[in-house]
Amino acid sequence: MHKKSIDHVIAINNAWKVSCFWNELIYPEDFPESKLPPVVHKSKKLTSAETYVAAQNNYGGFIYGGGTMAFTAGYYALYQYRPKTIAFIGCDMMYPEEGKTHFYGDGTADPLRDDITLQSLEAKSTRLMIHAAKQGCSLVNLSQDISRLTFPKISIDLLAQPPKLIDWNILAEKEALQLERKLNYFVASGKYWEQVHLFDKVNLQKIDQLWLDCIKN
């Protein structure tokens, strides 16, 4: 990986094992301690729910933002570092029935569980991308494989020049945000699964569709 145009690398969950060139590891509350790095150099940082929940809450919380670490890491990076570009790699959330899905073997990750916040990964991806663009930040996908992320795909060699910000339908975004505020589906602790009975699946589908309507290919 070329480091010239990359200021900060955030590894998600087990991804710290891929390379030693990471600055920060972000992981969920239920991540086994045995899977954390055995030794963490003073130049590296571990980030848990104690830090990232407040960050994602700043963008509407986990019910609207999506309860999976790929999106949580994105909102955290936006809040904490306010970068011009966030480049994702290895976060495509594709899980074929056969074959290797992760560098460590077969994965059964967050997007496969029955989660009311993850009915449309594409919608949640688009929502994150638009919130980033409003901060002047471009989201891109460095993976060249099929992806559930809706971010533009680019080569890592092009990161030295900040990618162009996306265009989106402002009216559709306004409608999505208005519906989010009206429903007020928010759990400050981030533990939305403890109150999932309070949230309507169909209403969340409506919000997802509005975010998808923001960008028409």
Question: Residue locations for each model-derived region?
Answer:
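Metal-ion/cofactor- or nucleotide/acyl-coenzyme-handling active-site neighborhoods
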Residues: M1-N217
